[in-house]
Amino acid sequence: MSPLPLVESDDNAIPLTLITDVKLDDWRNAQADAVKAWLSATGFSGKAGEICLMPRDDGTVASVMVGLGDGEDKWAAGRLARSLPEGTYRLDQIVGVQDKDKNQTATWVALAWCLGAYRFDRYKTEPSSLAAVLVWPDEVDRGYVEGAAEAAILTRDLINTPAEDMGPDALAAAAEALATEHGAVVKLTIGDDLLSENYPAIHAVGRAADVAPRLIDMVWGEADAPKVTLVGKGVCFDSGGLDIKPSSGMRWMKKDMGGAAHVLG
């Protein structure tokens, strides 16, 4: 898994101002004439995901304005990691969001930055570099950001892996690795054992494959705790029987195990 695009600190980090569209005029009117003129010239309106680079006199980036729209779009910062010039950035101001909600907004910015930076680079000789990184905002719930980002990245990696490298055995191995990391227990029911355990449908779908079908059963948590069961479809490549699907229907069948990937994530 690639490292998250979040760093501890950088004295030279470029400040980010996040602002809602309804507060933009008030904020702009309080700025210097040069700032007002630049915002007017670029047409920055504060809509969700909009970016405006604020220049220094020497042409380098002094700061960045980021639109939040009405403030309800959790993913407004999702394109920053891939749209901003190379460098380190820090969250400086959140304008137009109530104080009680600013910590939540900062948390969503950090998570959106992580998800926006994602690239599937398993088959690249040189993994994608992180051009724009964010200093951890003080207000964020780090545990939530790291957990949610790593979960989403795992899910994406499993789905993006082509079927030749993501068969039933590979998906089961991913589940076992996750179980080892988090203290869960995995039970695999493989091949003809599916019939004796009363899973005939799973057996029927995968019995002709070179790699035997299997049921992955992962259990985590205290035995006496309330039970929540998540079920995800894990067909690693659905050919529609004996390859009866047209090419347009076959193209994306590597993601037919996306339900299982989401459960693991």
Each model region followed by its residue ranges:
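N-terminal hydrophobic/helix-forming segments and targeting peptides
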Residues: M1-V235
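Alpha-helical metal-binding/catalytic segments enriched in His/Glu/Asp
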Residues: A175, K227-V228, D243-G265
